[in-house]
Amino acid sequence: MSTNARSTEMTKPDERYDVVVIGGGAAGLSAALILGRSRRRTLVVDAGEPRNAPAAHMHGVLSRDGMSPAAYLEAGRREIAEYGVEWRAGRVTGAAPDGRGGFAVTLADGTAVGARRLVVTTGLVDELPKLDGVAERWGRDVLHCPYCHGWEVRDRAFGVIAHPMMPAHQALMVSNWSKDVTLFLHTADGLSAHDAALLDAAGVTVVAGEVAGLVVEDDRLTGVRLSDGRVVAREVVFVGADRLVPGDGVLRRLGAALRETPFGEFVTVDETGRTSVPGVWAAGNVTGPQEQVVNAVGLGYRAGVAVNNELLLGDLEDAVAGRPRG
């Protein structure tokens, strides 16, 4: 992968940064950008696993609508390099207090760096339903977000595979982009009378029965196959993940507080992204599943500002008290 960002080929174990950003997606690069502009020595460690990688294009990002996720991140890496931020391909396997008010950060290749503060932006993984064709077509004609992809597939024949927790929700959402929507109840227990009325008002057709998989012909989705053998012709399928798995291993090992959400456990943060662990911030989809690229950028920016402010004021307080800088 080419990038103009200055990559560290081999970081010395005793090398210390003001901030290590763990994760190089939209939130991480945004935090790194403001930290670099704040003259903070910053390292971004990026495992290269963005949630939106399967998509050919991203949408709803002002001035970048239609840009590929890979090109967007490449542009971000070029920008952070202008401010001296270092970028490194790698995976952080752990972080622990270093006894100096900061953290020792270990990487999978055995190297280690020090950080006065951490910003964790490691995103999440969508665990998709185990149905034939879903994973293979994900991000192409199997989609989850109409705001991200609805315009590009408008007026086609939509199928929606119901999520057991909210069986009608996604079908109602996508009905604004097509008048030909079929909801497959799949494993959902059924519909409430209210949901059934809403679906009827939206013109959504409801099909009972468990989905077995998708029908793909000539590299094109053509239908949804039910377990009883029926095939319903469809051109696009919307489906939610069975489970959302945040990349929060480092945060959990540090003892960060978690909160329960309808989508599972996520790290608890304040409005700036500060976690319950002193010196550790988190931003982007690792903090919640509904952070689109534009939201992630804002959250990363906010975390970067908060980290810089804490370092600045902390250093001044130490200077006044005659303490060595942390």
Stretches with model-predicted labels:
Residues 2-17, 87-156, 240, 263, ...:
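FAD-binding core/adjacent interface of flavoenzyme oxidoreductases
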Residues 37, 41, 47-49, 56-83, ...:
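N-terminal glycine-rich dinucleotide-binding loop that anchors FAD/FMN and/or NAD(P) in oxidoreductases
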Residues 7-8, 130, 136-152, 243-294, ...:
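FAD-site-proximal beta/loop scaffold in flavoenzymes
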Residues 5, 74-107, 112-115, 178-265, ...:
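A Rossmann-like FAD-binding core segment of flavoenzymes
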Residues 17-71, 157, 162-189:
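Beta1-alpha1 glycine-rich phosphate/pyrophosphate-binding loop at the start
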